[in-house]
């Protein structure tokens, strides 16, 4: 049934009239450019296409292992949790709730869904579309509430599993309140390393701009810290980055309102960083002008602050530098080859290992081998890591696993592996039907 629902819903979302409706609805509540909002609709549609036909059935593929005697065999099953909850943030009003909701349903659960109330109209409309495509109305409960009310509901209803996507603060609170019966997709302080091989400067500057500033930096995968190898100092990468950032404008929402930080709080953060010795403002650092964005939201120009590497790793600065600012903001630093171990130490100390990019086509730089201690991939743990010249931190489509690593509570989104991991548990049924051998006698007690 869910294969059929997915096929119909994928078809509906492929109709220009419908995809345009959802794109514009997303834009109304989560300010981003048309292209970025459309990206959500597109990924959602492709995800639904992936689970048409028998693909939902195949998600629950089981296996059997021969037993010790005739009639015995063990079967491993992916088993649903039953009553589950899904909590999702404001920044992806369609993609995150649809992908997680359908994953929960595909694996046979009964979910209650709570989307951030600022943006939940998008999912309300999408549920109507899904009902129209055959989703039985009793299969999903949809609640609109604030966080406090949802917290109470979870504690009273006691779902067997809750999937939380949002800030680390709420994630940790819920992990305690729900006694660990939770999977998390929480904050990202995502980094990118430009390796020693300098090439394709324009392309790499463009990807950096998109990663840091698209959706005004309000993606959990947004580039927050950029490490640039000293070989790039001969290039005009920074000035290109500045030019690209300055192209962004409020009129088309290529930069726009920040929903969870005010202008003052972001500028105060910039000023605190500028007190660190050797740091400097590369560009931005000013409020947006000529707008009517209410002051409870933030509105700043795309901003980059340079902080020297040796200052970043100092105890007193580290926490400040690695604070997630959910807005158009990034830290930039540089490093020499001999300083790679310091870079790796800075990455290791981060608490949220979500996305990362290692921009290099030098395989020895990318890979770690046990006798080379300072290479990147083998020394880091981020769940979604892009490696190679075209590496990015954002843009993970439905065909890439997206989620943190290194935390047993870490969830994933999008792929069959993510769905099976998050929305089902392993159950083994050992069939042992006999026959009991004809000559069997009661053995001595053991
Ligand atoms: N890892 C990921 O996949 C991912 C994806 C998107 C966003 N994020 C993170 O989300 C954050 C931004 O989103 P946000 O500001 O909406 O996050 P948030 O934590 O404030 O809210 C997330 C959701 O939790 C609800 N909530 C808040 N308090 C709650 C409580 N006590 N009990 C139950 N529910 C509660 C909110 O109403 C909302 O629906 C950033 O930190 C970002 O990195 C992570």
Predicted features along the sequence, with ranges:
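Conserved C-terminal structural/oligomerization subdomain of aldehyde/semialdehyde dehydrogenase
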Residues: 1-7, 115, 135-137, 238, ...
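N-terminal Rossmann-like NAD(P)+-binding subdomain of aldehyde/semialdehyde dehydrogenases
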Residues: 1-73, 116
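Rossmann-like NAD(P) dinucleotide-binding subdomain of oxidoreductase/dehydrogenase enzymes
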Residues: 27, 58-204
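Hydrophobic alpha-helical scaffolding
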Residues: 34, 74, 116, 143, ...
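Hydrophobic packing residues within well-ordered alpha-helices of enzyme cores
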Residues: 48, 123-126, 153, 174, ...
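Short, solvent-exposed loop/turn segments at the edges of secondary structure
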Residues: 79, 99, 137, 177, ...
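Flexible loop/turn segments at secondary-structure boundaries
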Residues: 92-94, 119-120, 149-151, 170-171, ...
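ALDH superfamily catalytic-core signature
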Residues: 132-134, 157, 169-316, 338-341, ...
């Amino acid at each position: 049934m869910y294969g059929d629902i997915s096929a119909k819903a994928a078809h509906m979302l492929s109709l220009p009239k419908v995809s345009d409706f959802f794109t514009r609805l997303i834009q109304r509540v989560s300010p981003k450019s048309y292209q970025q909002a459309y990206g959500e609709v597109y990924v959602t549609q492709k995800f639904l296409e992936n689970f048409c036909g028998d693909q939902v059935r195949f998600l629950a593929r089981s296996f059997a292992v021969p037993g010790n005697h005739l009639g015995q065999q063990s079967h491993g099953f992916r088993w649903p949790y039953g009553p589950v909850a899904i909590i999702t943030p404001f920044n992806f009003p369609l993609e995150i709730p649809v992908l997680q909701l359908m994953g929960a349903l595909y694996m046979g659960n009964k979910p209650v869904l709570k989307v951030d109330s600022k943006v939940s109209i998008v999912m309300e409309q999408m549920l109507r579309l899904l009902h129209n495509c055959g989703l039985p109305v009793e299969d999903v409960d949809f609640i609109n509430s604030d966080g406090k009310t949802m917290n109470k509901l979870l504690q009273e209803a006691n779902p067997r599993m809750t999937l939380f996507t949002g800030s680390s603060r709420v994630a940790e609170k819920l992990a305690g309140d729900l006694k660990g019966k939770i999977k998390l997709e929480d904050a990202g302080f995502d980094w990118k390393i430009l390796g020693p091989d300098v090439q394709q400067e324009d392309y790499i500057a463009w990807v950096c701009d998109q990663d840091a500033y698209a959706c005004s930096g309000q993606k959990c995968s947004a580039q927050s810290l950029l490490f640039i190898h000293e070989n790039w100092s001969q290039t005009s990468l920074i000035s290109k980055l500045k030019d690209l950032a300055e192209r962004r404008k409020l009129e088309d929402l290529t930069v726009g309102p920040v929903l969870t930080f005010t202008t003052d709080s972001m500028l105060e953060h910039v000023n605190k960083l500028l007190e660190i010795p050797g740091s400097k403002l590369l560009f931005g650092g000013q409020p947006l002008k000529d707008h009517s964005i209410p002051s409870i939201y933030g509105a700043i120009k795309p901003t980059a602050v340079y902080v020297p590497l040796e200052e970043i790793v100092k105890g007193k600065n580290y926490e400040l530098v690695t604070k997630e600012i959910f807005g158009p903001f990034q830290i930039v630093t540089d490093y020499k080859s001999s300083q790679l171990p310091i870079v790796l130490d800075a990455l290791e100390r981060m608490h949220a290992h979500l996305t990362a990019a290692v921009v290099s086509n030098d395989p020895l730089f990318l890979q770690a081998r046990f006798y080379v201690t300072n290479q990147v991939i083998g020394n880091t743990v981020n769940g979604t890591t892009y490696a190679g010249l075209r590496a990015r931190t954002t843009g993970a489509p439905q065909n890439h696993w997206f989620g943190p690593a290194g935390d047993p509570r870490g969830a994933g989104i999008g792929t069959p592996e993510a769905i099976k991991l998050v929305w089902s548990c392993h159950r083994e049924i050992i069939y042992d039907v006999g026959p009991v051998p004809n000559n069997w006698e009661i053995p001595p007690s053991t």
